Amino acid sequence: MMQEKDSMFEQMTARGHDRLCFHHDKETGLRAIVAIHSTALGNALGGTRRWYYESEDDAVYDVLRLSKGMTYKAAISGLPMGGAKSVIMMPHREFGRTEAEARAMGRFVDTFNGAYIAAEDVGVDTQFIDWMAHETNHVMGGETVSRGGDPSPWTALGVFHGMRACLLQAGLGEDFVGKTVALQGVGHVGQNLCKLLHEAGAKLIVADINKTNLDTAVDEFGATVAHVDDILKAECD
């Protein structure tokens, strides 16, 4: 839940944002927000998150927080790009995605004329990006080669090597054999990370609000399930 009570302009100023844009598509009912934090290093790149928010304030808080993080992610990676993010506000948790919704989002993204480049995030996959690509060229992460493909395996690989570096820093070597790892969230990135850790010999404790994701982690990687409220207290390395 959102904790800040400042106005939208005050929140933007505090985080250093350039733009915060709202959109409603009458035909599909799409409600979406794009936040551009910075274009100092180039056009702003950031994923599209499709999520159920309990309030508009929660959605604004999330998109501002995430877009600022993207600025630093791009900069630390040496990319000539700025940071942005977008969120699609689902009317309820079980609201199914449609091509019409994705194309409406694509049209919204296209209004930025490349200043914002969308990509995958929670609730958005390669098919959704390909649907968006019917309306705009300013997307990455679709199924076609020209759109870059699913970034989840590469994100997971980066996290895996980051965890290995943490083991070394802690004086625990770089071997995951016998180590216990707790993962909060086992969606696209989480499943790929589970696979890498399992193959490296780690024992897994997982938590997720999606039962299908949990079942996959248990069946394929022998993971132990923890409640989402308990995962941060799980005994692990």
Pin down the residues of each PLM region.
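N-terminal ligand-binding/catalytic initiation module
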Residues: 1-147
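Glycine-rich phosphate/diphosphate-binding loop of Rossmann-like nucleotide-binding domains
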Residues: 150-237
